Each structure stands twice: as structure tokens, then as C-alpha cells.
Regions:
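Zinc-dependent deaminase
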Residues: 1-24, 91-153
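Stable alpha-helical structural segments in soluble proteins, enriched in small hydrophobic residues
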Residues: 14, 18-21, 57, 61-65
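Short beta-strand scaffold segments in enzyme catalytic cores
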Residues: 29-37
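A short, polar/charged loop-to-alpha-helix boundary motif
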Residues: 46-60
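Helix-adjacent hinge/juxtasegments
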Residues: 59, 63-95, 209-218
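N-terminal accessory segment detector
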Residues: 152-251, 267-283, 289-292
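A conserved amphipathic terminal alpha-helix motif
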Residues: 249-261
């Protein structure tokens, strides 16, 4: 008997397929077909790389499963990072798949601003009179990251920028942070505390997080050390693209952050403990110092 644990294991495989899709420049969908606890096929969408508008993850997975097993997929289940669209739901029905498991719903995507046909998989299956069980929301939090607009923008940016050109991304980020500082001077002037404390709260303000998400763990007259645990699109992008966050943060994000806090006091400095940074640690250790 299949359990939620099985569904989650299959979903993890589908998520890896979706990550491969994003690395290739496709749209970030993954699917797995399984029977009796055994994976028959796994696939991701190849619309862009194959220039094929119907090469969705579910259809690619069903085609592979049909070749690997048989045309009639009765007794099989399909696990997808995203709710199957109208076309994929039809393919699931025609292939006689018995169970559908997905993470993110069409409704979720529409709310996030994505263009989707607003017709649920459940409604399509209901109209077909097919007996197919549906389970939704499996590893939804993890699947949502695949369709987050901020993460997708960063994935596109890093995919199309050579490492030798990371300075372009750094310079763009620096300019945006300086502009943000100018646009928010009124609020910034209200920051309380000494220059170290103001710098700490300025970083939190820019990222849009609370102190509980990046608590101060050590404080002295000329240094503040805090541990960031907040949701970070850059971190998720690095995980998807297999980039080393230690390199990315050092080469791209450190100088713009330091230059930002130096607007408060030119003697302020910012760095990280690169031996203690996510995903290699549970948190990122970040350090603000005030030179004498």
C-alpha cells in the first residue's frame, strides 16, 4: 500500500527533474510515473530545448513509461511538481493512470500571476468519468520554490551570465541598493541605536526580514555577528543551478552590502564567515564591524 512517505520520495525525484529543466532553460516542471512502489519513468518538460509546445513533464514521463512498461498504465501513479494542465490531464486519462499526486495547484500559479488555463485536473477527470484518485499539496513548500518569480529571474540571470562576468551582476546589484537607499532615506533616518545597530537594522530593512530571522549572537563595541536563517531567493537559485554559495556571496553580494551600510558610516565593514554559510550550514554567519 502506498503511503504519504512514498509520495514524498517520488515528489523529491520530480523536483530534481524540475531543477534539471530550469538548468537547461526550460520551464521547471518534473514528473515521475511509478507502479507498486517502483519508478517506471521520470522526466521534465523540454518545451524550449526541443521547441515542442506539448513536451510537458507529464507527457514526457507518460511516453517514457509506455516505452519502458506498456501503453496501458493501469495501476500506475503519476507524481508531478505542478497540477497537470488540461492537455496533461487528458493524457493521464487516456493512458489509464490510476492516481495523480501533485505539489502546486493551478490556482496557486494563477494567484502568483502565471498564465494558466483555469481548469483543474479534478474537474477534467470528473467529466471523463475515469476513476482516478487525486492527492494534492505534496511537498508544496518545496515545489513552490520552483515557480517563485524572484528565484526564476535569478535562475535566468545566472544561467545566461558567465562566471567571468559576475561583476556585471555585482555592479547592477550595487546600483540598485544605492538607489534603494536614496528612495528610503526618510525611513532610514529613523533607525535607532549606534552605527553598528543601525547597519544591522538597515540590512534587515533592505532584505525585508525580522530580527528573529537573523538574530544577533554576539555583540561588542566594534562588532555584531548575526545568523541569517531567512528565506533567500539567491540561496535557492544556487541550489537549483549547483552553484557554490560561498563563491556567489563573496563575488557578488558582499561588496554591495558593505557599500550599503557604509552610507551610514564609511568606517563600517561587512563580511561573512564562509565556513558557516547555507546550505553547508543551518545558517549564514554574517559580521558587521566598525573600524577604529
Amino acid at each position: 500500500m502506498m503511503t504519504s512517505k512514498h509520495y514524498e520520495e517520488f515528489m523529491k525525484m520530480a523536483i530534481e527533474e524540475a531543477k534539471t529543466s530550469l538548468k537547461e532553460g526550460n520551464k521547471g516542471f518534473g514528473a515521475v510515473v511509478a507502479k507498486d512502489g517502483r519508478v517506471i519513468a521520470s522526466a521534465h518538460d523540454t518545451e524550449v530545448t526541443d521547441q515542442d509546445p506539448i513536451a510537458h513533464a507529464e507527457i514526457n514521463a507518460i511516453r517514457k513509461a509506455s516505452r519502458n512498461y506498456r501503453k496501458d498504465l493501469t495501476g500506475c501513479l503519476i507524481v508531478s511538481t505542478h497540477e497537470p494542465c488540461l492537455m496533461c490531464a487528458g493524457s493521464i486519462i487516456w493512458s489509464n493512470i490510476s492516481e495523480v499526486i501533485y505539489g502546486v495547484s493551478i490556482r496557486d500559479s494563477i494567484k502568483a500571476g502565471r498564465d494558466m488555463i483555469n481548469l483543474s485536473c479534478k474537474e477534467i477527470i470528473k467529466r471523463s468519468n475515469a476513476e482516478i484518485n487525486i492527492h494534492n499539496g505534496i511537498l508544496k513548500k518545496e515545489c513552490l520554490k520552483l515557480y517563485n518569480n524572484d528565484i526564476r529571474k535569478l535562475v535566468r540571470k545566472f544561467r545566461t551570465t558567465k562566471k567571468s562576468d559576475w561583476t556585471i551582476i555585482e555592479e547592477d546589484l550595487l546600483n540598485k541598493r544605492m538607489q534603494w537607499f536614496e528612495n528610503n532615506k526618510t525611513m532610514i533616518c529613523k533607525l535607532k541605536g549606534n552605527d553598528l545597530e543601525k547597519a544591522y537594522h538597515l540590512i534587515l530593512m533592505k532584505i525585508g526580514i525580522k530580527s528573529s530571522e537573523a538574530p544577533i549572537v554576539k555583540k561588542s563595541e566594534n562588532k555584531i555577528i548575526f545568523h541569517s536563517k531567512n528565506y533567500c531567493p539567491s540561496l535557492e537559485t544556487c541550489i537549483i543551478l549547483d552553484l557554490d554559495t560561498r563563491e556567489v556571496c563573496k563575488e557578488i553580494y558582499e561588496r554591495p552590502t558593505e557599500d550599503l551600510i557604509r552610507r551610514l558610516n564609511p568606517k563600517l565593514r561587512f563580511t561573512r564567515n564562509y565556513e558557516c554559510i547555507r546550505p553547508y550550514s543551518d545558517y549564514c554567519e554574517e559580521i558587521i564591524t566598525l573600524e577604529k
